[in-house]
Structure formats: C-alpha cells, structure tokens
C-alpha cells in the first residue's frame, strides 16, 4: 500500500491542478460503463475509464478506503462523496484534454522518437524511487491499475502538457525592481531567523462588545481574567486568551489578525480587530525579532518565487480563456 501511494504521489505531481443513453432499466456491463462518455471536449470523448484509471482517482479511492474502510464506497454517503471527487477530477481531465489539443495547435508536440525518449527518462526516474527494484516497481504498477504501456502513455501526455504550459509562460519576466518592492513590503519574511510573537486575544461577536472589553482593559483590568469571563474562543478562553508563540509568517491565522498583531509592540493591546470570526482584542505578551537579511542575499529567491506566481497567473488566465472558447459537454450521470 505504501509503495502504491508513493507512485500515485509521484504521478499526481505532474497534473496541474498543478464529466441517458438507451434505457435506465438495463444495467450496463462493466465494459460498457468503462467506455461510457463522461465528457466531450471539442468533439473528443473522455471515457469513464479515463477517470477511473487516473492517478488522482486511484489516490482518492485509496485514501477513502484507508480512512473509512473497504465498504464505504458502496454506501449512499460513500457514493455521493466519490461522485463529488469524480466531478473535481473530471474537471482536471477536461483541462488536460484542452491542453493536449492546444499542443497540436501550437506545434509543441515532439516527434515520436523524442517523446518516447523523454517518457522513458521519466519512467526511469520513477523506478529510481523504488531503488530500481523491477519487481517492486511492477507490483506497484499493478496495484495502481497501470501497466508499463499505459504508464508510458500517461507520461507522454504529461510531457506535452508541460510543453504547452512552458509555451504559455515563456515570456514571463521579473525585474530587479519587482523583487526590491516585494522585499521592502515583506521584510519580516527575510529575517536571519523567523520572527515570533507570544499572543493572547479575546474574541467576541460584536463591535460593541469588543469596545466594552477594551474599556475594561484600559482601566487596567487583568487581561487573562477578562478573557476567561467573556472570550468566545473555546480553545484559548480557559488559558486566559493565550494563543502562544506565533511566527510572523503563520498562515493558520486570519491575515487581518496577523497584520494587526505584527504591528503591535510588546505589552501593547489592540483596538477591536474585525475578522471572519468576530471581533478580537489582541495582546502581545512578548516578541522575538531578528535582523533582516540583505536584499542581495535573497534577491534571486524572491525573483524565482515571483516568477512562479506570475507563470501560474498567466497559465490560469490562458486555460480559462481556452476552456471558455471550447465546446465542452459533461455527462455526470455516467460518473457512477
């Protein structure tokens, strides 16, 4: 099972991320179900087997079986969960189909000899994950529904998709001034060590409640005592509102909350801060801040990051444009 998950994980990295015929009373054979059309993209069919045999779908089914047991997918709840997952994966397959069609249009598909050579190289890279153990590799292929031939065909498609994406994003550039601007606006991200702050807060529903809390604190009432009385954050209330040490770059907290907290000095208490959770009164118990690295030492890393972000934006914009211009029809009734 671990080997299968490892292969699926490797294969799924290549996917950018990076649908009534006859009589319903007649149940289709497994072969007929596999060949049933779940989508058409500019006249080209996507069959159910394309979805069911995809690495993403295999990974989803593996996770569902591990988490909920072998019988879950047979239940009504399981069928609904799987159908929703299939709809998402079908959207990926539609995107891939559009990209493959554009590969022909843009003339970026390599000649057969070169494409086979690149695919063989990727196969060897996957084998290396298994220390070139041929038996283990073949067992894993079998457990994930692949043969050597279907794996190679899948990889050839991914190579073409990668070339289309490269074509779309080839003109993306980032100037030094862009990196300098990002550096100036995000200096807390480039310290010698991660900056941290020890934070407490009191969470209430309304602004009026928050103002009353702030008034009590301004009158020198104990923060922890007030938090235990009125805070609606059950996770920190009994600890006097203590959240503990938080890195300045922690993405688990609301960005508005983080911005307000970072702006405070040690010992300071904020005015009411509104987030999706309600109104916070934030207290900074202490801070550990470190020197900022010189711009020249982080410039190339910043440019690389910004380039990747711009490439993703360019790709997303282009694929949305292509899909909008395509004739796409899905057949969700054929997903299960």
From Swiss-Prot:
A lipid is attached at residue 23 (S-diacylglycerol cysteine). SUPFAM superfamilies: FKBP-like, Triger factor/SurA peptide-binding domain-like. It is an enzyme of class 5 (isomerase). One of its GO terms (cellular component) is plasma membrane. Keywords: Cell membrane, Isomerase, Lipoprotein, Membrane, Palmitate, Rotamase, Signal. Residues 194-286 form the PpiC domain. Gene3D superfamilies: 3.10.50.40, Porin chaperone SurA, peptide-binding domain. Residues 1-22 form the signal peptide. It is found in: Cell membrane. A lipid is attached at residue 23 (N-palmitoyl cysteine). It comes from the Bacteria. GO terms for biological process: protein folding. Belongs to the PrsA family. Plays a major role in protein secretion by helping the post-translocational extracellular folding of several secreted proteins. This is Foldase protein PrsA. The gene is prsA.
């Amino acid at each position: 099972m671990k080997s299968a998950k490892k292969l699926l994980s490797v294969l799924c990295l290549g996917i950018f991320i990076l649908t009534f015929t006859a009589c319903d009373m007649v149940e289709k054979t497994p072969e007929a179900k596999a060949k049933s059309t779940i989508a058409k993209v500019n006249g080209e069919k996507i069959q159910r087997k394309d979805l069911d045999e995809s690495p993403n779908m295999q990974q989803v089914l593996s996770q569902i079986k591990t988490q909920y047991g072998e019988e879950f997918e047979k239940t009504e709840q399981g069928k609904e969960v799987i159908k929703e997952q299939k709809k998402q994966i079908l959207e990926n397959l539609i995107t891939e189909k559009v990209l493959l069609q554009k590969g022909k249009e843009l003339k970026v598909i390599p000649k057969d000899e070169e494409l086979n050579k690149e695919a063989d190289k990727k196969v060897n890279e996957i084998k290396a994950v298994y220390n070139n153990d041929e038996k283990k590799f073949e067992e894993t292929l079998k457990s994930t529904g692949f043969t050597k031939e279907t794996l190679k065909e899948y990889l050839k498609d991914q190579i073409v998709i990668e070339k289309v994406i490269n074509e779309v994003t080839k003109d993306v550039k980032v100037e030094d001034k862009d990196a300098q601007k990002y550096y100036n606006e995000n200096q807390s991200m480039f310290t010698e060590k991660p900056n941290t702050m020890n934070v407490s807060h009191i969470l209430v529903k309304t602004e009026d409640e928050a103002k009353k809390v702030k008034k009590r604190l301004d009158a020198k009432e104990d923060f922890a005592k007030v938090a235990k009385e009125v805070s609606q954050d059950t996770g920190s209330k009994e600890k006097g509102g203590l959240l503990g040490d938080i890195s300045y770059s922690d993405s688990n907290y609301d960005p508005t909350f983080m911005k307000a907290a970072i702006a405070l000095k040690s010992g300071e208490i904020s005015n009411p801060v509104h987030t999706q959770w309600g109104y916070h009164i934030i207290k900074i118990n202490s801070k550990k801040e470190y020197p900022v690295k010189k711009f020249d030492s982080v410039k190339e890393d910043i440019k690389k990051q910004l380039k990747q972000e711009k490439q993703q934006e360019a790709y997303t914009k282009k694929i949305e444009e292509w899909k909008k211009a395509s004739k796409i029809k899905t057949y969700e009734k054929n997903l299960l």
